[in-house]
């Protein structure tokens, strides 16, 4: 019965250190393999309009990071694939499940992307299963990521349909209000949901949403994630596509959810909101800091690579690790 499983989130967990076996954190290897490719970090900037654009996707691919391009500029997807392939870079795009997307997928046979993410808010759906099967029939070599889901049943069904990885997380993100608008989701127990889903998974899981600190990346890996998708920590950079807004002499960047009125351009089925984040430095600096913090996590885990994080003990700290402090 579900109510018997422990329910917790990132701030309720502390990982327990092991004896360190490396002399410098720079010896810790943060690389991860997804499909046929190796990437520098197990981290993916969220495929949202205020997080990633074609320029950032190109920069990430050149530097050895994984990326997923958003699906909200549909006509530019084929030229984007061409541009990436001309530079010898991987193409990783998103699709929805509407009827015209089937034709679009079939048209990719001439220039096939290495990765396609089926990206809808409630991914445990016949429409997603049908699209997975269609992609796998038309583009058998393409690595298919499907989501988003929040239960082991959903993970199994999408894997059985042919998904190569599933994305876990329904509404735990900072600008996602699914949990408030619908009463459903993994907000407040995303880490427990990840653990629950990972136990059923035979293929990689991508934890998506609810990441507030770099330490949460290590916690996600401990509870079964192969990769971690992050929105708010990647928003607000100088290069971020979000609009720059000045308030009382300070500069901010817009950050909004993928199902928000701002993204949809109209007021319907809204499950996202818009916030302003203080402008921070360059994206490359954040990625470097994330890598260094993850290397420190590996050193605390007593290992040399990400696998060591999967085996550490943990405690559930019910008064929250912040103890009244805010991040």
From Swiss-Prot:
Q: Identify the catalytic residues.
A: 176 (thioimidate intermediate)
Against SMART domains, the record matches this protein to: IMPDH (SM01240)
Under which main EC class is this enzyme filed? oxidoreductase
Q: Which reaction does it catalyse?
A: IMP + NH4(+) + NADP(+) = GMP + NADPH + 2 H(+)
State any GO CC term. Answer: cytosol
Protein's UniProt keywords contain Oxidoreductase: yes
InterPro entries hit by this protein: Aldolase_TIM, GMP_reductase, GuaC_type_2, IMP_DH/GMP_Rdtase_CS, IMP_DH_GMPRt
Which parts form a coiled-coil structure per UniProt?
Answer: none
Q: What is this protein called?
A: GMP reductase
**Gene that specifies this protein:** guaC
